[in-house]
Amino acid sequence: MAQEQKQPRKSSEADEAVEAVAETDVSERKEALDSDVDDILDEIDDVLETNAEDFVKSFIQKGGE
């Protein structure tokens, strides 16, 4: 014989409020991450503009390193 479990349901207004807060948090986090990525890319561009050859050489392995 199967037993049914009853779970309380949240009101739709409460669900909408939680979703709105979550979307706001996500969008703020995305904006912050986008800004951080842009800063890193700008820094890489600056390094490449001033010293591209040394930058590339730093990634080349030498003799089995």
UniProtKB/Swiss-Prot annotation:
| Any GO MF annotation of the entry | proteasome binding
| Pathway(s) of this molecule | Protein degradation; proteasomal Pup-dependent pathway
Which key words tag this protein in UniProt? Coiled coil, Isopeptide bond, Ubl conjugation pathway
Please name the GO terms of the biological process aspect recorded for this protein, alphabetically: modification-dependent protein catabolic process; proteasomal protein catabolic process; protein pupylation
Coiled-coil intervals in this record?
A: 25-49
Positions with biased composition (Basic and acidic residues): 1-13
Family matches, as InterPro entries: Ubiquitin-like_Pup
Query: How the protein assembles, per its UniProt entry?
Result: Strongly interacts with the proteasome-associated ATPase ARC through a hydrophobic interface; the interacting region of Pup lies in its C-terminal half. There is one Pup binding site per ARC hexamer ring.
The name under which this protein is listed is Prokaryotic ubiquitin-like protein Pup
Q: Which gene encodes it?
A: pup
